[in-house]
Amino acid sequence: MSQNLYAQFSGTPMAREDIERLLRTQGYGICSLCDDGTPYSIPISFGYDGESIYLPFLAEGPRSTKAEIVSEGTVARLLVTTISGRFNWRSVSVTGPLRSVDPDTAEFEQFIATLDDNGWFMRGFERADSLDSFQGWRLDPETIQGLERTEGPIE
């Protein structure tokens, strides 16, 4: 790939305030986990409170692959993107360990409030009575990176 062609598709680092804005407004992304070397990625709703990312693990049916893979301290990566064209996109990657949110604590109330504030629930999980499992997890960011491309092609 020529340098000029690469430059047309590569991004530039996002400002911290733009990263924060995307995490607060998008409400959904792709969460990647790893089980014995096999990657597992899923679309997921999330809430962001300015420090932590809250992830609801929801399941319909008797088993949840997410719940089987995750344990306290499992490292996850959340990818959040907006794409409105070939040369107009933003992408934020957040990596860090997962911590369980106990439903009998004040933190669980914070988890629910944050999801209510800026989370976005997938259509398949609109009916709470159809869920067999609901777990709260907190992703503690160790690395947050953002790239964007908001211009037309390079001439």
Identify the meaning behind each predicted range:
Residues 2-43, 47:
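An N-terminal domain-cap segment
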Residues 2-8, 86-155:
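Charged, gly/pro-rich active-site loop segments
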Residues 19, 62-66, 107-111:
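Amphipathic alpha-helical interface surfaces
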Residues 23, 69-70, 115:
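A generic structural signal for nonpolar/aromatic side chains embedded in well-ordered alpha-helices
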Residues 27-29, 42, 49-51, 72-76, ...:
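A generic structural signal for short beta-strands and their flanking turns/coil linkers
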Residues 47-84:
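A short mixed-secondary-structure module that forms the rim of ligand-binding clefts
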